[in-house]
Amino acid sequence: MSRPRLEAHSNSSKPALSSRPNTPTIGLALGGGGARGLAHIAMLEAFDELGLRPKVIAGTSIGAIVGAAYASGIPAKVLRAHTRELLTQRFGLMREVFAERPLQRLRGLFSGSSSLFDAEAVLELIMPKGVAADFDALDIPLKIVASDFYDQEAQVFTSGAVRTAVAASMALPAIFKPVVVNNKALIDGGLTNPLPYDLLSGDADIIVAIDVSGAPVPDPRRNYPSAVEALFASAFLFERTIVREKLKSHQPDILVPAGTSHFQILDLMKVDDILAAAEPTKERLKAQLERILSVETLPQINDALPALTPSATAPAKSKRPGLLGRRKHKEPDNS
């Protein structure tokens, strides 16, 4: 019995890999990471340029924002153009919202005078036109992760209002108000499942996880973080610990560190720099997807290899070139 085909995006400039028979399906997990998650756009461009379309997407925080737009049928290039226009205008609304006011509001927390942002209202301002209002209207099935503050567990959305689910997933404490859904106070999904590839088990043949978390990069001017950096980095330290523990027991087939860990989580104004930094990883992802999907049938691909540490010194033709080389070809058994 043949496997279902991947659908091809019409904006691809080359023959779609999904036009081949028995092409395995792909589940795509987009992790949380603040501004670093703008790199998701570049990774989605890799899919579009190959003519591939994920069978299902799971997203957390900024991964939920980007994932909701893409699952609505908005091509990655359109997302790139929209995001650049939104964040690079000199006097644009988002420069005020994301570059200045969060820090002022953080200071207000300590004086009791802070009023936090409404995540749904912010989404209404920043989301591109064409994002589906309801999960049922999405082109690609989507799972969005938020965190239940009081029950201290993940809340996964697969139905209902898309904007409400995304708002809950991105409601980072100290910046956004919790989003109340069915009498539950929901906050940033990264606090319970920052890289939700495990939600895709059984939904697709190959699971690809895009990790945009990364570790803090030391400032050469001082040997300790600023107060704001420490506040946010502490949350991401916790999230990276969750991911590491998950990887010990359950791994995606392709784990992609996006290469943007040296950016701060509020560096949204550096959108061009972040996208440029993600470009080499995008090309490696394209090469890996082409290699995997060029085999005739899925059984010719070995089970996922153990997680590997990327190495700048690894030979160019190495069969194990790091986290992007977790699968290798297996010659068919003709006996």
Predicted regions and their residues:
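Patatin-like phospholipase
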Residues: M1-T60, A68-S335
